[in-house]
């Protein structure tokens, strides 16, 4: 079943319905991303995330004017660099972000992607096919051939230092066969046999067993004690580097061969095809072989084989344009719906969830699945007692497929849509044009809880140690009722919480105190204004410089800011018009929470590149593209991925393609790498 089948066809949506769905999808994906990357506790399977992400991409393509600047499709989630995370692992900033791959679920979608890629590349491409290993991404840095650092993907911008743990994985070389300085990336996974042995041992010891090999690998790699990691028998495959020039190769298939020569573990199942029509045979082959492989796979990765073309195609801020992942169709099982519950999110959206008899799907025990919204529930007509098909979209998120009507109990009744909020009992509102049912009571306990969790999260105020369980305890003990109460907490109050010793209390108070000094874009994100995420908050902070300026700005002024728009401006204005918000802002100011925009460096506005729209193309010698882009942005430039009439400057390396041709047609100034060095007087 194609994951897209759950959604209303885009062509049948009204503009207002599309707008509402885009907003709700963005909220859901942001929440799920936080759970996955920050809290290591996802509430939905990967398949559900992938399906909703693909839906958001399609909606934004159909309605580009509705795409929000802070959309999950427009950025890799980012956070501030801090010394350690809640586990005690040191944070590592990735100089080149570790991007996710775009997902497709059918051969036709692969063929469609091939058409776009061929058009952008200017010619038919050969592709390197690789198995998509079901593990977690790893970055390995070598200097003069010696392993000096290993880090997890994290949120794509910041990962965790797991060097000592990785050194216990025998397959990963500590010293390369050549003294190269290079960063490579790959996958850490747990073989099926090792996973079975580990779970048997844990079961015998009375410990909780792991749901699947990926979770086991992730938990094993992120141990504070390398001795524990060593006992888990992890494995690895290496498949990528951004430094192909170091290897002296021209194709992705050659990259894999050079990795073998250097001593890296490389999966031997890759295959080069001349055209995308050949991909079906490869997919069919490994669909059959999948269950008999000694490791888990959840799809096939397709990569442009020509590295020069890869470089030319580049990346969006979220995904590479030169590669895509085909996800295997989800596994299905039959189960019985025993209950339908309703939960309230941060923005007041009330979501139905099916509670079912537990079943195993793709190695995971599943007993809950979101029913998304009242319209979806009524369209599916899911009733308590129904037998339903359950699958994992993209092998990740549990989803109810079909109701088996012939098995429906005679007394099964259509499930009523609630009239009152399950948390605060306020009357629910179904806003015209929206699919969501909302609680609009600002004092709703569920919304307050979710708002506090969001306020403390990594992308917001980044209060380490203030997770969902702590927030729940603080609320249940009446130690806090609203956001500003966090800044009045004392160590003695925190010691009354379960599992909170003096040190834990001291650490949390220190984390709360540190958050007072955050630059104001974090506070803007943390306030939870509908549609305003981290990226939009940064734009607003840079423009207004102070929270009070934003609070007092009119909707028209806000809407004129590049990348904001009228919908977000109206939401911001509506938010600050609230008396309770005005009171909250005053309280935060009284608690000395910083309201100012703190720039990381002073930009010399006289430098040649300041305020210019710049595009990079071609192969560079002295710089990598990410390094040059970072330098330009630090010095006030706006770096774009495509040439347009608004482009001020094209910086061209060697082996350039269509961007140079387009720049020349538009009369845009073009300089080379040496010109850049001369103008900037910059050293890498």
Swiss-Prot record:
The active site is at residue 132. It is an enzyme of class 6 (ligase). One of its GO terms (cellular component) is cytosol. Keywords: DNA damage, DNA repair, DNA replication, Ligase, Magnesium, Manganese, Metal-binding, NAD, Zinc. NAD(+) binds at residues 46-50, 100-101, 130, 153, 187, 303, 327. Residues 604-684 form the BRCT domain. Zn(2+) binds at residues 421, 424, 439, 444. PROSITE patterns: BRCT (PS50172), DNA_LIGASE_N1 (PS01055), DNA_LIGASE_N2 (PS01056). CDD domains: BRCT_DNA_ligase_like, LIGANc. One of its GO terms (biological process) is DNA repair. One of its GO terms (molecular function) is metal ion binding. Its EC number is 6.5.1.2. Signal peptide: none annotated. It catalyses: NAD(+) + (deoxyribonucleotide)n-3'-hydroxyl + 5'-phospho-(deoxyribonucleotide)m = (deoxyribonucleotide)n+m + AMP + beta-nicotinamide D-nucleotide. Its cofactor is Mg(2+); Mn(2+). SUPFAM superfamilies: BRCT domain (SSF52113), DNA ligase/mRNA capping enzyme, catalytic domain (SSF56091), Nucleic acid-binding proteins (SSF50249), RuvA domain 2-like (SSF47781). The keyword Ligase applies. SMART domains: BRCT, HhH1, LIGANc. DNA ligase that catalyzes the formation of phosphodiester linkages between 5'-phosphoryl and 3'-hydroxyl groups in double-stranded DNA using NAD as a coenzyme and as the energy source for the reaction. It is essential for DNA replication and repair of damaged DNA. Belongs to the NAD-dependent DNA ligase family. LigA subfamily. This is DNA ligase. It comes from Oenococcus oeni (strain ATCC BAA-331 / PSU-1).
């Amino acid at each position: 079943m194609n994951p897209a089948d759950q959604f209303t066809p885009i062509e049948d949506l009204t503009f207002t319905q599309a707008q509402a769905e885009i907003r709700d999808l963005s909220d859901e994906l942001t929440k799920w991303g936080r759970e996955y990357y920050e809290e290591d506790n996802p509430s939905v399977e990967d398949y559900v995330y992938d399906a909703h992400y693909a839906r958001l991409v399609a909606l934004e393509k159909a309605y580009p004017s509705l795409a929000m600047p802070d959309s999950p499709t427009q950025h890799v989630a980012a956070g501030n660099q801090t010394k350690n995370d809640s586990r005690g692992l040191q944070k590592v900033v990735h100089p080149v972000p570790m991007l996710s791959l775009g997902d497709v679920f059918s051969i036709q979608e692969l063929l469609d992607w091939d058409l776009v890629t061929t058009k952008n590349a200017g010619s038919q491409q050969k592709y390197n096919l690789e198995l998509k290993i079901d593990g977690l991404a790893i970055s390995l840095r070598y200097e003069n051939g010696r392993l000096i650092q290993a880090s997890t993907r994290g949120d794509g911008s910041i990962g965790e230092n797991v060097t000592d743990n990785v050194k216990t994985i025998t397959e990963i070389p500590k010293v390369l066969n050549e003294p190269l300085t290079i960063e490579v990336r790959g996958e850490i996974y747990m073989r099926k046999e090792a996973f079975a042995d580990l779970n048997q041992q844990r079961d015998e010891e009375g410990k909780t067993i792991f749901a699947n090999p990926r979770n086991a690998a992730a938990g094993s790699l992120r141990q504070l004690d390398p001795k524990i990691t060593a006992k888990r028998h992890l494995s690895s495959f290496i498949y990528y580097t951004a430094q192909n020039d170091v290897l002296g190769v021209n194709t992705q298939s050659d990259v894999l061969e050079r990795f073998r020569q250097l001593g890296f573990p490389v999966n031997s199942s890759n295959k080069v095809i001349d055209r995308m029509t050949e991909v079906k045979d490869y997919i069919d082959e490994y669909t059959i072989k999948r269950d008999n492989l000694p490791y888990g796979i959840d799809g096939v990765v397709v990569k442009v084989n020509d590295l020069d073309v890869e470089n030319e195609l580049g990346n969006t801020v979220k995904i590479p344009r030169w590669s895509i992942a085909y996800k295997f169709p989800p596994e299905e099982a039959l189960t019985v719906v025993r209950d339908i519950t309703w939960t309230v999110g941060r923005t007041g959206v009330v979501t139905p969830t099916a509670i079912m008899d537990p079943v195993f799907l793709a190695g995971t025990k599943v007993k809950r699945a979101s029913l998304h919204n009242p319209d979806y529930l009524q369209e599916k007509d899911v009733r308590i007692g129904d037998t339903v098909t359950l699958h994992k979209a993209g092998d990740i998120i549990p989803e109810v497929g079909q109701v088996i009507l012939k098995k429906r109990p005679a007394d099964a009744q259509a499930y009523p849509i609630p009239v009152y909020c399950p948390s605060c009992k306020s009357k629910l509102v179904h806003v015209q044009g929206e699919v969501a049912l909302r609680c609009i009571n600002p004092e709703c306990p569920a919304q307050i809880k979710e708002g506090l969790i969001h306020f403390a999260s990594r992308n917001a105020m980044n209060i380490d140690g203030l997770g969902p369980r702590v927030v729940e305890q603080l609320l249940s003990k009446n130690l806090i009722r609203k956001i500003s109460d966090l800044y009045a907490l004392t160590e003695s109050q925190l010691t009354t919480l379960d599992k909170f010793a003096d040190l834990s209390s001291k650490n949390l108070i220190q984390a709360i105190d540190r958050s007072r000094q955050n630059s104001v874009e974090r506070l803007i994100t943390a306030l939870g204004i509908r549609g305003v995420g981290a990226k939009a908050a940064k734009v607003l902070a840079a423009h207004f410089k102070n929270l009070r300026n934003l609070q007092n700005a009119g909707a028209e002024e806000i809407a004129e800011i590049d990348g904001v728009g009228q919908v977000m401006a109206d939401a911001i204005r509506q938010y600050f018009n609230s008396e309770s918000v005005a009171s909250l802002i005053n309280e935060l100011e009284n608690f000395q929470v910083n309201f100012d925009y703190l720039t990381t460096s002073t930009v010399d506005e006289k430098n040649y590149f300041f305020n210019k729209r710049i595009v990079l193309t071609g192969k560079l010698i002295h710089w990598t593209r990410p390094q040059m882009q970072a330098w330009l942005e630090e010095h006030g430039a706006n770096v774009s991925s495509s040439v347009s009439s608004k482009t001020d400057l094209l910086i061209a390396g060697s082996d350039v393609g269509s961007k140079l041709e387009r720049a020349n047609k538009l009369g845009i100034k073009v300089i080379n790498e040496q010109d850049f060095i001369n103008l900037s007087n910059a050293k890498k």
